[in-house]
Amino acid sequence: LKPGILVIDIGGSGIKAAVVDEQGNLLSERLRVLTPHPCLPSVLIDTVVELVAPCPAYNRISIGFPGAIRNGLILTAANLDSREWIGFDLPDALSRRLGNHPARIINDADLQGFALIQGKGLEMVITLGTGFGSALFRDGQLMPHLELAHHPVSDNLTYDQYLGNAALKKIDVSEWNERLLRVLDVLEVLLHADHIVLTGGNVRLVTVDLPPSVSIAPSDSGISGGAALWRHRT
């Protein structure tokens, strides 16, 4: 078998990994471990190295990270509880621990989005988990990343605070669902997207009827998007 691409999807609650081929098909089982907290870079790297030890051969690494990325460096990491992430070169650090294979990094919602979009029109992928992640695509091409997570949406609450895990500690699931519908209304006015995909660990909580243009994808279905980092300039 030709060596695959190791995909590491880092979230505020969990870290997932698998090896995929160039089309994104799984070559290994999906592995998962809880994200350590507080999550310093050295702690996360040790956790990832241990997690991926059973993986079959790979010669490239794709990383999805819960924050804003520019030129391979991390700009924000609000859900990982450490300022050591700011400016950190995670691809280089992981590459040195994992056989010096070339590594690329992208926002985690962007990574998952490549696996979930249809490739036609204006599409948005929203991850509902520890925080609120978003990715925007036009005709299959990734648009400049919009970090909506930290933008005010209602009563001076950011999207993270309004729909993330912090909100679920204060409101019941019914109210959370109503908030989700209000956010979808806001995004409809803002973007008029042809298709919106909801994914992430908290999509299991969605009970309301969604607009026809909105669909749900299982939280583990996006990892194959890591193959796209080696097909597209990101």
Please place each PLM-identified region on the residue numbering.
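Short glycine-aspartate micro-motif
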Residues: 5-9, 60-62, 123-127, 197
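Short glycine-rich, Thr/Ser-proximal phosphate-binding strand/loop in the N-terminal lobe
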Residues: 2-43, 141-170
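Glycine-rich phosphate-binding loop plus the immediately following alpha-helix
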Residues: 90-112, 141-179
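Anionic-ligand binding region
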Residues: 121-124, 130-153
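Glycine-rich phosphate-binding loop and adjoining helix at the ATP-binding site
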Residues: 29-53, 57-62, 68-122, 161-162, ...
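A short, acidic, amphipathic alpha-helical segment used as a generic capping/interface helix at domain edges
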Residues: 176-190
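Glycine-rich phosphate-binding loops at beta-strand->alpha-helix junctions
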Residues: 14, 187-219
